[in-house]
Structures are given as C-alpha cells and as structure tokens.
C-alpha cells in the first residue's frame, strides 16, 4: 500500500497486525484510544476485525523449520507447565487446569482475587522483576469488550460471561519456552508466590 494519507497509513498498519492499536506506532493516536478503552489491556486493543499479515518468506521458512521439533517442544512445554503448577501457591492462583491433550506456549495464570487494586500491584511486581506477561491470557481478554466487535455483536451486559470476565481482569499468560530450564521456572514461581495478594 502506498499512500500520503496519514489516516489510511495508520489504519493499514493496524489492519496487517490483527487490528492492534499498538501497531500503528503513533503515540498520540494510541494514547487517545487507550484513554477511550481503559477497561482493556493497553497492549491488546483491537480496533479492526482482521488477521496477521506481518509475516513474510523468512518467517515462513523459520516456521517450516520449527515444525521438525514441534512434537519434542510440545512435550517440553507440557512438562514445564506441570512443574509450574506443582510449585504454584494454590491459595493465590487457580491451578485446577485440564491438562489432557494440552500443550501450552505460555503459563496461564489466574489470580484468586477480585480486587483491581491487588491486580495492579501484582502487575507492577511482575514488571519490576522483569517477568513479561499478557493480561487477558492470549491477549485482548473478553473479545466482547473489544472495539472491533461492537458493530457485529450488540452485547453490553457482560454478567452472563463470568469466566471470560474473570480472565479478562485477572488472567495472565507468561511465556513457556521449550528451552526454559527448571531453575528459571522455580525462580518465576518463587517471585509469584512471594507477591502479597491481599488488599
């Protein structure tokens, strides 16, 4: 796409990247949208219904090459997740996941709190300890709250969607890389278990 129209330029960047606001790379525009949608995770606001068109031939080649180790990596990820859950404080975090047939590229983490104040403190603690995370699990949380879907689905009362609402506000993903060592997982869990999750 070639354009000298700034609006089309910004929209095009979002359209190639899941419709995510952060991909516009325009801080003034981004700030305006974040302020308008304060109930969404600021890194995962989707304005347009679209796909991910960012990849290229190099990405495809890397992806095809990674398929060779897919089965091995899936086993490692599952083992990592079981190890992670085994050491996690169940008073602070939900740990009762169905693991049958599951291999997750991340550690899903759900807080056992309903306090936004506690949640915000939790996020600061992760940031200070250099633990990268996504709130709302894979990103974006409750899709019914996302701007892109509002013209298709007219739901404004989210009380019938208790589970996804809990994930939206108190669910996280932390990376589960196949080469993640047990010592590193222990360190992450130690940090998580030491966070005071009370008001």
Predicted regions, residues:
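Conserved PLP cofactor-binding pocket of PLP-dependent enzymes
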Residues: 18-34, 83, 122-160, 166-172
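Active-site region of PLP-dependent enzymes
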Residues: 1-106, 141
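PLP-dependent enzyme catalytic core of the Aspartate aminotransferase-like
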Residues: 150-199
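Short amphipathic alpha-helices in soluble, non-transmembrane regions
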Residues: 12, 119-129, 188-193
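Short beta-strand-to-loop capping motifs
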Residues: 3, 109-113, 176
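Short, conserved charged micro-motifs
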Residues: 114-121, 181-186
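Secondary-structure transition into beta-strands, especially the periplasmic turns and strand N-termini
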Residues: 6-7, 115-118, 125
């Amino acid at each position: 796409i070639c354009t000298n129209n700034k609006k089309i330029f910004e929209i095009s960047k979002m359209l190639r990247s899941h419709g995510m606001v952060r991909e516009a790379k325009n801080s003034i525009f981004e700030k305006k949208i974040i302020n308008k949608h304060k109930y969404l995770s600021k890194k995962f606001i989707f304005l347009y219904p679209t796909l991910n068109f960012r990849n290229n031939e190099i990405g495809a080649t890397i992806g095809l090459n990674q398929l060779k180790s897919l089965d091995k990596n899936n086993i490692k990820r599952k083992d990592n997740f079981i190890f992670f859950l085994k050491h996690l404080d169940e008073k602070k975090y939900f740990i009762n996941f169905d693991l049958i047939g599951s291999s997750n590229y991340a550690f899903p983490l759900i807080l056992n709190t309903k306090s936004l104040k506690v949640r915000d403190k939790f996020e600061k603690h992760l940031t200070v300890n250099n633990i990268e995370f996504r709130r709302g699990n894979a990103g974006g949380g409750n899709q019914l709250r996302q701007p892109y879907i509002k013209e298709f689905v007219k739901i404004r009362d989210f009380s019938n969607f208790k589970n996804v609402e809990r994930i939206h506000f108190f669910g996280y993903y932390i990376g589960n890389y196949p080469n993640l060592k047990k010592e590193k997982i222990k360190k992450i869990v130690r940090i998580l278990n030491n966070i005071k999750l009370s008001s």
